[in-house]
C-alpha cells in the first residue's frame, strides 16, 4: 500500500453500532429545544430543599455525573434488596428497606438538581437531556422491583406482573406524547409524587416489616398490600388517560402527525410488542418462570424497555422516524422460541442469556449514542467545559422543576 494512502472505511455494520445517528439527525439535534410544561403538587415545597442542596454541589461537578451517581446509588440499594428477596415473597432485614428508602430519596434529589447544576454552570445541552431521560428509563425499572419487594407482592403474581410493567408503560407513554406534541407535560401527580410515595412504603416496611402488608383489613377483607396496588391502578388510569388525550388529538406535524411527520400511533408498536411478549412468556411458561424468578424476568424486560425508551427520546430530539427493527428484541425472542420448541433449553438458563444480551445491547447503544453526540457537539460527558453548547431550554408557564435537562 502506498505511503500516505487513506485508511479503509469502517464496515457499515460497525459504523451503525458505533454511530447510531446519521449526519442529518445530528444536524436536527443541534436545532432541538427542550420544552416542558406543568407543575406537580410537591414541587413548590421541594424547590426550597433542592435549591438548598444545590449550594453544596461543587461547580466542577458535571450535571451528568450527578445523574449517574444518583442512578448508581438507586440501583445498588435495590440490588441488595433483590439479593435477599429474589422471588419477591421473602422478608429482608429491616436495614435493606431503609437503605432503599435512602437510595431512592438520594436519587430523586440528585435527579432534581442535575438540570439546576447545568444552568448554574452554563452547560445545558441536548446530550444532558438524553442522558437524564436514559438514566430515568432504567431507574423506573428498579423502582418498580424494589417497591414490589417491600410489600411482598410476589404472593400475588398477576398483581406483581402488572405493577412491574405498568411503570415502564407510563414512562414510555409520557415520552410518546412528547414525540407527538413536542412538549413534555407534567401532571399534578407525577414522578416526584410517585418517588416520595415509594420512599414512604420503604420506611413503613423498615419499621413494620414486609409481612405487615399481609395484614387483612377488617370489613373490607383485603390485605393491606392491595391498597398501594389500587393506588397504582388509579394513578395509571389517570395518567394514561391524559397521555392518550394528547396522543389521539393529533400532533404538531403535518396533518396532525408526530414531530417527525409519522403516525401518532406508530410508537405504540414497540412498547406493545414488549408487553405482549412479556405476557405470553409469563402465561405460557411450563416452569413458572416469572413466579420463580420475577426480579430477573423484570430486569431483563426492563433493559429492553430502557433501550426502546432511549430510542424514542432521541427520535423526538432529532425529529426522526422510530424504526421497529432492532437487536433489542433478541433476548425476549430467545425465550419465545425456547417455549415454541417445548423448552429445548432450560428456561432459567435462557432467561440469563437473554438478560446478558439485553443489558449489553442497551448499554452499548446508550454509550455509543452519548459518545457520538458528545463528539459532534464538542462536549465532555462527565466534565464541564467552556465549549458547552448554548442553552436550549424552553419552559412553558407555569414553571416546573422537572424542566431540569442539562
From Swiss-Prot:
Pathway: Phospholipid metabolism; phosphatidylcholine biosynthesis; phosphatidylcholine from phosphocholine: step 2/2. Its cofactor is Mg(2+); Mn(2+). It is an enzyme of class 2 (transferase). The active site is at residue 133. The chain crosses the membrane at residues 63-83, 94-118, 126-150, 161-179, 191-207, 223-248, 266-281, 294-316, 330-339, 347-376. InterPro entries: CDP-OH_P_trans (IPR000462), CDP-OH_PTrfase_TM_dom (IPR043130), CDP_ALCOHOL_P_TRANSF_CS (IPR048254), CHOPT (IPR014472). Keywords: Acetylation, Golgi apparatus, Lipid biosynthesis, Lipid metabolism, Magnesium, Manganese, Membrane, Metal-binding, Phospholipid biosynthesis, Phospholipid metabolism, Transferase, Transmembrane, Transmembrane helix. It is found in: Golgi apparatus membrane. GO terms for cellular component: endoplasmic reticulum membrane; Golgi apparatus; Golgi membrane. Residues 2-62, 119-125, 180-190, 249-265, 317-329, 377-406 are cytoplasmic. CDP-choline binds at residues 64, 119. The record marks 129 as: Increases basicity of active site His. The keyword NADP does not apply. It catalyses: CDP-choline + a 1,2-diacyl-sn-glycerol = a 1,2-diacyl-sn-glycero-3-phosphocholine + CMP + H(+); 1-octadecanoyl-2-(5Z,8Z,11Z,14Z-eicosatetraenoyl)-sn-glycerol + CDP-choline = 1-octadecanoyl-2-(5Z,8Z,11Z,14Z-eicosatetraenoyl)-sn-glycero-3-phosphocholine + CMP + H(+); 1-hexadecanoyl-2-(9Z-octadecenoyl)-sn-glycerol + CDP-choline = 1-hexadecanoyl-2-(9Z-octadecenoyl)-sn-glycero-3-phosphocholine + CMP + H(+); 1-hexadecanoyl-2-(4Z,7Z,10Z,13Z,16Z,19Z-docosahexaenoyl)-sn-glycerol + CDP-choline = 1-hexadecanoyl-2-(4Z,7Z,10Z,13Z,16Z,19Z-docosahexaenoyl)-sn-glycero-3-phosphocholine + CMP + H(+). Its EC number is 2.7.8.2. GO terms for molecular function: diacylglycerol cholinephosphotransferase activity; metal ion binding. Mg(2+) 1 binds at residues 111, 114, 132. Belongs to the CDP-alcohol phosphatidyltransferase class-I family. Catalyzes the final step of de novo phosphatidylcholine (PC) synthesis, i.e. the transfer of choline phosphate from CDP-choline to the free hydroxyl of a diacylglycerol (DAG), producing a PC. It thereby plays a central role in the formation and maintenance of vesicular membranes. This is Cholinephosphotransferase 1. The gene is CHPT1.
Amino acid at each position: 500500500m502506498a505511503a500516505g494512502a487513506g485508511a479503509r472505511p469502517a464496515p457499515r455494520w460497525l459504523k451503525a453500532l458505533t454511530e447510531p445517528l446519521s449526519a442529518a439527525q445530528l444536524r436536527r439535534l443541534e436545532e432541538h429545544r427542550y420544552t416542558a410544561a406543568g407543575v406537580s403538587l410537591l414541587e413548590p415545597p421541594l424547590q426550597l430543599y433542592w435549591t438548598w442542596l444545590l449550594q453544596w454541589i461543587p461547580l466542577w461537578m458535571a450535571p451528568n455525573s450527578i445523574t449517574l451517581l444518583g442512578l448508581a446509588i438507586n440501583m445498588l440499594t435495590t440490588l441488595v434488596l433483590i439479593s435477599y428477596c429474589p422471588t419477591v415473597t421473602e422478608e429482608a432485614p429491616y436495614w435493606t428497606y431503609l437503605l432503599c428508602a435512602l437510595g431512592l430519596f438520594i436519587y430523586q434529589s440528585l435527579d432534581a438538581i442535575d438540570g439546576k447544576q447545568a444552568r448554574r454552570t452554563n452547560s445545558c445541552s441536548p446530550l444532558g437531556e438524553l442522558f437524564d431521560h436514559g438514566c430515568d428509563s432504567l431507574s423506573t425499572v428498579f423502582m418498580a422491583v424494589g417497591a414490589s419487594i417491600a410489600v411482598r407482592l410476589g404472593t400475588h403474581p398477576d398483581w406483581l406482573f402488572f405493577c412491574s410493567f405498568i411503570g415502564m408503560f407510563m414512562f414510555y407513554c409520557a415520552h410518546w406524547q412528547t414525540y407527538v406534541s413536542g412538549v413534555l407535560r407534567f401532571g399534578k401527580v407525577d414522578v416526584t409524587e410517585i418517588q416520595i410515595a415509594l420512599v414512604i412504603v420503604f420506611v413503613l416496611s423498615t419499621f413494620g416489616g414486609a409481612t405487615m402488608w399481609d395484614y387483612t383489613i377488617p370489613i373490607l377483607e383485603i390485605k393491606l398490600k392491595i391498597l398501594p396496588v389500587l393506588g397504582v391502578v388509579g394513578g395509571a388510569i389517570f395518567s394514561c388517560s391524559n397521555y392518550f388525550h394528547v396522543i389521539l388529538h393529533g400532533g404538531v406535524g403535518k396533518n396532525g402527525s408526530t414531530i417527525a411527520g409519522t403516525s401518532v400511533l406508530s410508537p405504540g408498536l414497540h412498547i406493545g410488542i414488549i408487553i405482549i411478549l412479556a405476557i405470553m412468556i409469563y402465561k405460557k411458561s411450563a416452569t413458572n418462570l416469572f413466579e420463580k424468578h420475577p426480579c430477573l424476568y423484570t430486569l431483563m424486560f426492563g433493559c429492553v424497555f430502557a433501550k426502546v425508551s432511549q430510542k424514542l427520546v432521541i427520535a423526538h430530539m432529532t425529529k426522526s422516524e422510530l424504526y421497529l427493527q432492532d437487536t433489542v428484541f433478541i433476548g425476549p425472542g430467545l425465550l419465545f422460541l425456547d417455549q415454541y420448541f417445548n423448552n429445548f433449553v432450560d428456561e432459567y438458563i435462557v432467561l440469563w442469556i437473554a438478560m446478558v444480551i439485553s443489558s449489553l445491547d442497551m448499554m452499548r447503544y446508550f454509550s455509543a449514542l452519548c459518545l457520538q453526540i458528545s463528539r459532534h457537539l464538542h462536549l465532555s460527558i462527565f466534565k464541564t467545559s467552556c465549549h458547552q453548547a448554548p442553552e436550549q431550554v424552553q419552559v412553558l408557564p407555569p414553571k416546573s422543576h422537572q424542566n431540569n435537562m442539562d
